[in-house]
């Protein structure tokens, strides 16, 4: 049987173990526009040269293994291998560096975040020669992006569906997150929506437990939405969590909610990218918005030296599909440095983002007109945080006050009213040219003079702050 010889065949097969850097470290390589580029923070074991550690990452995340193999002669490694094309020392870190690796596009299945991540991060993180490894950023080429659907609808389509413009959207996670009956759950939804919120939502771990089966919850929530819409004249919504044990069950729950224009919610990391992409395509086909919760993200992204940065997970989610995703708050109870957070918020929402190392963005990213994803600020926020949230996140965001609504001393509806009044006051002040960060306290106090609900919330939470140093910084 005849076949064409590759460059490797012309040299001949040489069995044995050789340094990775002899094959996979190519500092003279110029990345192509079609390459997927990765920036890894590498901490090698003592005694392992930087070039060898970087080349090992390139090899083990593409075509390499620990020894030469005869079947290398049956392909063209120069065409398919990953290449470490640059090593960047980190100031103040003698044992760490950034390795830049280019992957040929042919290594990846079209439209598959699952396959892309399996290759790039699936095996190499357990490599013994590395003390720690973190994927800081990816550059996804336009040629690969065009094989993905992306978000089911995107920011502008959501605005048009809801007929709400010029301000962030206001939401609330129903608490307690577990234990309520379906009927009492629906009651809380109704009270929050009637009080002035745009949305309420399921929490990440409410699926279909013995105390509240999914079908019962969906039906009581539907009644609550319809009643609140009729009374307020506004379009209302609730994020129904359809995360399930199987993809078939997940799609069945989404199909059940389709007829009353529901908003679907999904835990994209615990359920997996295959399930998320499947659900995203179903939501686009059926005209349903898709809300994404990032449950489990901190297991991967919180440690500075090991794991996957959330900006990478955010890019992957935009490709896989979701109309909004939780991003942290900067000011609330959850981890989030301001510069870093705004960096990946822009990566979610904007069409073209320039490289900006001050915000942790290692590569310029062109999204090729893929719809944007709305950022969701949620976790330990209350009315005093409203000016900062509006200033930080702008209009294309969902601000979700769970305890900051349901913890109001007068009940759920007054809690919702307090948040709506605070939001409207901040938007008016911003539009009048006032400085929300400098004058935010005065703006809230002025609004509280004519809103007893807001005044009560201000008094309750005036001492509550979450002032801890962020662990993940530039």
Swiss-Prot record:
GO biological process terms on file: photorespiration; reductive pentose-phosphate cycle
Record's miscellaneous remark: The basic functional RuBisCO is composed of a large chain homodimer in a 'head-to-tail' conformation. In form I RuBisCO this homodimer is arranged in a barrel-like tetramer with the small subunits forming a tetrameric 'cap' on each end of the 'barrel'.
UniProt entry keywords in alphabetical sequence: Bacterial microcompartment, Calvin cycle, Carbon dioxide fixation, Carboxysome, Disulfide bond, Lyase, Magnesium, Metal-binding, Monooxygenase, Oxidoreductase, Photorespiration, Photosynthesis
Assembly and interaction partners: Heterohexadecamer of 8 large chains and 8 small chains; disulfide-linked. The disulfide link is formed within the large subunit homodimers.
Entry PTM: The disulfide bond which can form in the large chain dimeric partners within the hexadecamer appears to be associated with oxidative stress and protein turnover.
Names of required cofactors: Mg(2+)
Reactions catalysed, as given in the entry: 2 (2R)-3-phosphoglycerate + 2 H(+) = D-ribulose 1,5-bisphosphate + CO2 + H2O; D-ribulose 1,5-bisphosphate + O2 = 2-phosphoglycolate + (2R)-3-phosphoglycerate + 2 H(+)
Gene Ontology CC: carboxysome
Gene name for this UniProt entry: cbbL
Record-listed E.C. numbers: 4.1.1.39
Similarity-based family: Belongs to the RuBisCO large chain family. Type I subfamily.
Residues binding Mg(2+), per UniProt: 201, 203-204
Residue numbers binding substrate: 123, 173, 177, 294, 326, 378
N6-carboxylysine: residues carrying this PTM: 201
Lineage: superkingdom: Bacteria
Cofactor binding notes: Binds 1 Mg(2+) ion per subunit.
Name this protein carries in UniProt: Ribulose bisphosphate carboxylase large chain
Subcellular localization: Carboxysome
Source organism: Synechococcus sp
Pfam families (UniProt xref): RuBisCO_large, RuBisCO_large_N
